[in-house]
Amino acid sequence: MADMTRVDFHTNVPDKLAYACRLARKAYMAGNKIVVLAGNSAQLDAMNAAMWTLSPTDFVPHVLAGDPLAAQTPIVLTDSEEVELPHHDILVNVSQLPPENYAQFQRVFEIVSTDEQDAQAGRQRFLHYRKLNLQPTHFVAGKS
């Protein structure tokens, strides 16, 4: 099943959380169910806040993993792979580590910011996927 997972790297992203919010909204509007993986509780809280303030006109339905409504809510936010995740369409990774459970998802988006430390972690994740015989694609934000 792992070889069926498509991995897309989006690099050179100026605001990682805002970008992840827009990507999740776009995927939701296309009918997908999404899990957003944060690196820690502080990043998870920031991601949750960013979802609420994404747009004054759009509501992006989301809950934290473990919420009783998680299975019915199209976007689930988590900072742990240990919790039960109800969705398996798309994983948006904003953490600096490769997700161990990537193979549960049809598609993984790796979001890499312009920060040098984050870019270095992104390169390590790219190599990690290559070692798993996956062929990640690379999209540079801001370039067409």
Describe every region a protein language model picked out:
Residues 107-118:
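Trafficking entry modules
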Residues 2-103, 114, 132-135, 140-144:
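Positively charged, polar, low-complexity stretches
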